[in-house]
């Protein structure tokens, strides 16, 4: 884990779980999709899933959480969505509307790129939750990773409102802390099926451009 840079804390390049059967040690599941894309839409239209997005593409990719000048109250001090990221957000929202995917809660981090992705895609967000934030370090210790896992796990394992899907728009490192999967590229979504208790099952992953073709 290394602050949205895709590198691990020991300086080596992070694993590339998006295309491999990577073991997710935090929950003991494999990241291989367990459902065909052709049936994914029908499943999520029934509700009951957590859809975790990493925010869409930014102009630059660096660990701004470690910048002492960064303020969560000042968007100008943070990474900004790029033209591509703005387009991705709009297209995700249009696909959800066109395919009538039911959305209940929309939970975002306190970072501007997170809630702006939500505003562009869905026109709103329900709740800002600091548990989705980065810890203010570029490199994380084992205790930092455990803290992020403790913070985020309840959000991923709690069932959504009946007949809806819960959308979470967050960041890479907190998601990796819980699942062992580095969410790449920016804008990728993971479909999770919570057990209503302390865990969940990873169902599939969807790239920003794939929502329109489900």
Feature roles, as predicted:
Residues 35-38, 152-153, 176:
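Short alpha-helical segments and helix-capping/turn motifs at coil-helix boundaries
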């Amino acid at each position: 884990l290394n602050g949205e840079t895709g590198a691990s804390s020991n300086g080596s390049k992070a694993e590339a779980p998006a295309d491999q059967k990577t073991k997710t040690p935090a929950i003991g599941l494999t990241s291989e999709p367990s459902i065909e894309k052709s049936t994914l839409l029908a499943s999520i239209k029934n509700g009951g899933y957590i859809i975790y997005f990493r925010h869409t593409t930014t102009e630059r990719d660096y660990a701004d959480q470690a910048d002492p000048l960064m303020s969560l109250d000042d968007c100008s001090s943070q990474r900004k969505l790029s033209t591509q990221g703005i387009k991705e957000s709009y297209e995700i929202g249009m696909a959800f509307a066109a395919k009538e995917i039911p959305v209940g809660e929309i939970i975002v981090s306190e970072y501007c790129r997170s809630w702006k992705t939500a505003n562009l895609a869905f026109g709103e967000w329900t709740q800002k939750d600091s548990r989705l934030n980065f810890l203010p370090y570029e490199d994380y210790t084992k205790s930092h990773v455990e803290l992020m896992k403790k913070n985020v796990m309840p959000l991923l394992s709690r069932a959504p409102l009946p007949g809806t899907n819960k959308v979470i728009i967050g960041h890479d490192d907190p998601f990796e802390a819980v699942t062992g999967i580095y969410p790449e590229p920016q804008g990728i979504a993971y479909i999770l099926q919570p057990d209503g208790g302390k865990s969940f099952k990873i169902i599939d992953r969807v790239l920003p451009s794939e929502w329109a073709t489900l």
